[in-house]
Amino acid sequence: MRFLRGFVFSLAFTLYKVTATAEIGSEINVENEAPPDGLSWEEWHMDHEHQLKDYTPETFFALHDIKKKGFLDENDILSLYGLNREEIVGAGDGMGQHDESEKIDNEMAKRVVSLIMRLLDVDDNTKITKEEYLQFAKRGNKFPDLGVGVGHHSDFELEYEIHHWNKFHKDKDPDVKVVHKEDIEHELLHHEHEIEHEEEIQRGASRATVITDDELESRIELKNIPEKFKNGIF
């Protein structure tokens, strides 16, 4: 994943960024997702994941203080950046091809937490209090793009519901009379993921085992795919 792509809060912070980048290293896999032009990572995250184009620092903090503790801890930061899981299935949002799936690099996740703590945890107690964050935001700062994508909070099934099902089917078309390509893409991803994990159990394979899309699709039982998702395609 591309790491530390571009967050410049000030000339001094630019110097800090260079140091941090060197410390992190270059062994991280490349992540292709990037904020749209004109948006910071934080703004991109809030728009894409929370459907909020306008928000206050108080709203941002409340949404990401998961247990309403009054501070952000390691788990909150991992959740914010979509790293609170063992693997990212497909593109992470319920879409994509199964070959795109990847395991979360635990060392990288630790470095993400460490960097964010160094930026915001003023008293160095491994907690980012609401006041610490509000002071950070008051200076015009925002959570930086660390090259790990938009920060999907949930697994690929729930992300599909959030970004597609709730928008197009939940109220308007609960019986899926209108099938979109996203519905079929997600259904295939779901079946491929199930097959891979069944194979891991049967073979005693490690989590690093990779099965190609062609192999997975050849084993999908079309009769198990609900008719509402076929729409004459299969």
From Swiss-Prot:
The entry's keywords: Phosphoprotein, Repeat, Signal
MF GO annotations: calcium ion binding
Gene3D superfamilies: EF-hand
PTM annotation (Phosphothreonine): residues: T212
Domain called EF-hand: residue spans: 52-87, 108-143
GO cellular component entries: cytoplasm; endoplasmic reticulum-Golgi intermediate compartment; fungal-type vacuole
InterPro entries tied to this protein: EF-hand-dom_pair, EF_hand_dom, Nucleobindin
Source taxon at top rank: Eukaryota
Signal peptide: 1-22
Annotated S-S bridges: none
PROSITE patterns: EF_HAND_2
Other observations noted: Present with 6900 molecules/cell in log phase SD medium.
The name this protein goes by in its record: Protein SSP120
